[in-house]
Amino acid sequence: MPDLIGLDFETYSDVDLKKHGLYRYTESPFFRPLLVGLATPAASSWYFDISQHSKQLAREYIGDAIHDSTIVAHNVPFERRVLAWLDLHYPAKRFIDSAVVARAVGAASKLEAAAPQLLGVDKMDEGTKLIRMFSVPGKHQEANGNNAFDSEITTLNRREWDQFGQYCALDAKLGLNIVLQYISWLTPAEQDYSAITLRMNETGWCVDVPLVEEMQRRYLENQEVALQEFRFRYAEPDLNLNSLKQMKEWCAARGVKANSFSKERVEKLIAALDKKFEDKTITAQQWDNYKAVWDLLHTKQILGGSSLKKLKVILNIATLDSEEPETHRLRDQYVHIGAGQTWRTTGRSVQMQNLKRLRSEVDDMDELVDDPESEWDNSKLADNLRQVFTATDPNGRLLVGDFSSVESRGLAYLAGEQWKL
């Protein structure tokens, strides 16, 4: 095994990491690393206070500490982004992600859960409190009138600052120990796949942000129109379509029993009502009642639009490409061995693997942007959501593929049934 070094950063940014993603977080002008924790198999862990030193000194210190070691971090993409901010660039193969290792052996992904499961050691309980104190804007930024990190907070809270450093160093040590004890679970090939996923996430996917903005505008407009039309037609200005209780009572009053309004249940209810409309024995009043419920369910579908909720997520996290200023990219979208039981790569954020498959005949997206009078309902928008992703080259093509019956072929491979493959 090559020489290993555990690495962990504690950082500051005014951007919400969960909402806006790793790249928006680190591209904020107020982003900065605060502490680095380091650990080696032969020595105890330690931390270095980056906040008190220049970027150049921090780069030299960390670069010298890493030297030619393989870097272990829990959730490598984050540490790689911070290293890149410090102008420290290492090949993806120089990293081992202890979170991937933890998931591979069936443990939790987060270090606070994986460490006690795999090592019998807990993270420091004070971590969340310390992150809130030092890593996000607070009263110091409010007093200063800007969101820049204020080093005075470290002077006024020396004990907590030292605790934060110990917390950072412990995380570096815990991640390293997970790898030392369990890396044998990952074959060299699987480690290569992990590096490929990392590079894929960093390269990202080109996305047409102006098109996303237009689709988002129409999506919200369609929602508002549908809701207002329903309220006007049935004189229901106060009916809350997000209230399960009110929805159940409204449907029950019209002869339709409904216990859930999930996407699947709404589809089944609409199908059941379509059959009732074919029943020649129902009265005119029943027909009107069923039609009212049908309209309510259809409105609920328009308001739900789970696929189109991805539009806002894309707008929240897409960033400009530094090498192609006119191009936006979506990055950090996949988690290697995200599903520990099956070792499947899973999605995060936009969940690109769940994008609706394009029909054989796609719609012209130029019409959407160039003709504001064209009508695109939310179903049509959802059918074409995949088209917001584009080829890198303006004259290129984006090839979209899918494995046919991949699960059955996996089982066939394990069973030696070559005919299925």
Label each region the model flagged.
Residues 73-75, 243, 401:
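Short His-Asn-centered micro-motif
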Residues 124:
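Conserved nucleotide-sugar phosphate-binding/catalytic loop shared by glycosyltransferases and other
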Residues 1-10, 15-17, 28-30, 35-40, ...:
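Conserved "right-hand" nucleotidyltransferase catalytic core of DNA-directed polymerases
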Residues 79-85, 110-117, 177, 246:
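Alpha-helical scaffold elements adjacent to nucleotide-binding pockets in ATP/GTP-utilizing enzyme cores
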Residues 65-71, 237, 395-399:
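Short active-site oxyanion
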Residues 1-109, 360-373, 377, 412-414, ...:
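Conserved RNase H-like, two-metal-ion catalytic cores of nucleic-acid enzymes
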